[in-house]
Design a protein with these regions (language model features):
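Aromatic- and acidic-residue-enriched segments that line the glycan-binding/catalytic groove
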Residues: 110-116, 129, 140-165, 215-219, ...
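N-terminal carbohydrate-binding accessory modules
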Residues: 37-95, 125
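An active-site-proximal structural segment forming one wall of the substrate-binding cleft
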Residues: 119-136, 159-196
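Active-site neighborhood of glycoside hydrolase catalytic domains
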Residues: 170-246
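Catalytic-core region of carbohydrate-active enzymes that cleave or remodel glycosidic bonds
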Residues: 225, 229, 256-363, 367, ...
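Aromatic-lined ligand-binding clefts that engage carbohydrates, nucleic acids, or primary amines
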Residues: 450-466, 495, 561-584, 591-592, ...
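Aromatic-lined substrate-binding rim segments of carbohydrate-active enzymes
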Residues: 81-147, 219-224
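The substrate-binding groove and active-site-proximal loops of carbohydrate-active enzymes
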Residues: 66-77, 102-118, 156-176, 200-211, ...
């Protein structure tokens, strides 16, 4: 029980400006009994959208101070959900917050999946069984360092598509998704006696636009789908509230450590007397390929967390546990003045690593950290609650080196092309592909005995280039490259461009134009190249490979290994170059020797006693490759230069 009564504003602490009257307004709405008289049904008849209360919010719905942490169900193996939830409760949390991810639930238009790893309703039920309330953030856009912010790539098959807008094609697709999601989540809302106390509309829209008519339309879509209008709220940075908020919805504040005082003052100025709900308190940060590891000390954050809770604020820690962006789901940032969809390769593109450890209180593999105990002490000092004991950390195993001696070349197992004779290479979206790799081939009509420039106007996002199967170099969007000089070319030679989608941009103005593959027509020596054949290589499910012998270049390597018992381990990819790993059919995600991430998390839940299968696709394969399983993660290796793209510009 909080030391702050829900029905009373606590006195201001000295760290908050004395002239501001802030506080906790948990009783501005009564608990669930007062919410039972929803007007949703009548709204469906009249077409009116039931109003909410700008002085409400999750704490008002819950009738108590909310102490929450973020944990996203697709990033944690389902077998481990309960372990993580128990640890959340043991740290002193009373609520779990999660996004819902449109792209994993609707991989193809109109086809929905809420089973297995995607069973959000079961995730919510398990949280409730562990004594936790739940906040759900359905998006439709979620950011989250997730490919395209959770938007499904098939949206961009419509050449007129404008996401996060009132464009009819977007709103119709979003409504269909929200309808399906609400069937899973709405029965679990507090208004129906369930644990869900908050539903966020959109996500930090103020950092993207200020079309309030769009936000009104999106709110109406939520209500039509069946989400309770009393549970709805928006979230933005403190300086962007005016752009993203709606006048009658509660607002949440998202900000970095050390910013609480200014953020609370901004909220008071924007909406005097409003209850304080911190939607995201960034207790860590994410990492980019080729950059240094990000960490944040927990001592000062624990002190600020205590101050916020003492001031009566409800707080969500982003993240409680980060987990892993398994498969192709890691996204990318596009920072800087050129970050818009018209500048293409000039965008400051920063792809995210596979690990979403986030330096959070609970590590990628669910281990408690010093930050966990610092936050636990801070929370308990305010609530006085007797907390459950901290569950034991999961056991780890090591794996002896696994030789990847036998492989099969990508060139020997290409599928039939999905498009031929194209004047301009189609993007992944154009051919109905979402993730993985895509190959473009054409025969050169003219040769040259002198150096010539191959120009790819926009690479999304990493292109390996070959002439008659011989590697020439790579062009990396991350390095703002567009051009590779070829020493010479023969007439009739086959030019192959193998493009990896290393993650669509998930944040910022570059969002609308995000497509994967090649965008625009390549040129060689100033002449536009045409006659392209396109090969779709989604690698989902993982391909069936016949590994017969040594292999170089883009190769699949297949091997088996034995374990006596299943346990978590970390595959050391230091000897590999760039690619992806599958174990027993599970895509562990991308690796890249530019760092800082060196190990891929292999959950024990993906293993079985006895024989296990590993499949590695390495873009720059060579004989003698091997991997081994370590007992600890290595996420802070020194960044390196990619030698394969060193000659491009």
């Amino acid at each position: 029980m909080s030391t702050t009564s829900p029905g009373r504003r606590p006195p201001f602490r000295r760290w908050i400006h004395s002239g501001i009257a802030l506080g906790f307004a948990g009783a501005l709405l009564a608990p669930s009994t007062a919410l039972a008289g929803e007007a949703v049904a009548s709204a469906a008849v009249t077409g009116e959208v039931p109003r909410s209360d700008p002085m409400g919010g999750p704490a008002a719905v819950a009738g108590r101070q909310v102490i929450s942490g973020s944990m996203f169900y697709p990033r944690i193996p389902r077998a481990y959900w309960r372990d993580r939830l128990k640890k959340a409760r043991a740290m002193g949390l009373n609520t779990i917050e999660t996004y819902a991810f449109w792209n994993v639930h609707e991989r193809a238009p109109g086809t929905f999946d809420f089973t297995g790893q995607n069973d959000i309703a079961e995730f919510i039920r398990e949280a409730a069984e562990e004594g936790l309330m739940v906040i759900v953030r359905p998006g439709p856009y979620v950011c989250a360092e997730w490919d395209w912010g959770g938007l499904p790539p098939w949206l961009n098959k419509d050449p007129q598509m404008v996401v996060r807008s009132q464009y009819p094609g977007f709103m119709a697709a979003a409504q269909r998704y929200l309808n399906a999601l609400a069937k899973e989540v709405a029965p679990l809302q507090k208004t129906n006696g369930g644990p869900v106390i908050g539903i966020q509309v959109e996500n930090e829209y103020g950092s993207y636009g200020e079309d309030h008519a769009y936000m009104e339309a999106m709110r109406a879509a939520f209500v039509r789908a069946g989400f309770s209008p009393r549970l709805l709220f928006t979230a933005d940075g403190p300086d962007l509230l005016q752009r993203g908020a709606l006048p009658d919805l509660p607002v949440a504040l998202n900000f970095a450590p050390g910013s609480a005082k200014g953020a609370f003052a901004a909220l008071e100025k924007f909406r005097p007397g409003a209850p304080i709900f911190v939607g995201e308190y960034w207790d860590g940060w994410f990492d980019h390929w080729g950059a240094k590891r990000e960490t944040r000390d927990g001592t000062a954050m624990a002190a600020e967390l205590k101050q916020m809770l003492e001031a009566g604020a409800s707080v969500n820690l982003y993240m409680f546990t980060g987990g892993t962006s398994f498969g192709w789901m890691a996204g990318a940032n596009a920072a800087g003045a050129n970050a818009d969809h018209t500048t293409g390769a000039k965008v400051n593109y920063e792809p995210d690593v596979t690990s979403y450890d986030y330096d959070s209180p609970l590590s990628e593999d669910g281990r408690v950290t010093p930050k966990f105990f610092a936050f636990r002490d801070a929370i308990q000092s305010v609530t006085g609650e007797a907390l459950p004991p901290v569950p034991q950390d999961p056991g780890t195993i090591t794996l002896a080196p696994i030789a990847l001696g036998k492989g099969q070349s990508l060139w020997s197992r290409l599928p039939a092309p999905v498009a031929t004779g194209s004047e301009v290479p189609p993007t992944m979206e154009d051919v109905g592909q979402s993730y993985g790799y895509i190959l473009y081939r054409t025969k050169l009509g003219e040769g040259a005995e002198h150096p010539v420039d191959l120009v790819l106007p926009e690479v999304r996002a990493y292109a390996a280039i070959y002439l008659d199967g011989v590697f020439q170099g790579a062009i990396d969007r991350r390095l703002k490259q567009t051009t590779l000089t070829l020493a010479s070319v023969k007439r009739g030679a086959t030019l192959s461009i193998l493009v990896e989608n290393t993650g669509r941009v998930n944040y910022g103005p570059a969002l609308p134009g995000e497509r994967a593959g090649l965008v625009g027509a390549p040129k060689l020596d100033g002449r536009t190249l045409s006659g392209w054949s396109t090969y779709s290589l989604p690698m989902n499910p993982p391909p069936k490979v016949t590994a017969k012998g040594a292999c170089e270049g883009p190769c699949f390597y297949k091997a088996s290994f034995e374990v006596e018992r299943a346990g978590d381990t970390f595959l050391d990819t230091a000897g590999l170059s760039k690619g992806v790993v599958f174990v027993n059919g599970h895509n562990l995600g991308r690796y890249w020797n530019v760092g800082p991430q060196r190990t891929l998390y292999l959950p024990g839940a993906f293993l079985k006693p006895g024989r296990n299968e590993i499949l590695v696709f390495d873009l720059y394969g060579r004989p003698g490759l091997r991997v081994e399983g370590l007992a600890k993660a290595e996420l802070g290796a020194e960044p390196k230069v990619d030698p394969h793209s060193a000659q491009a510009r």
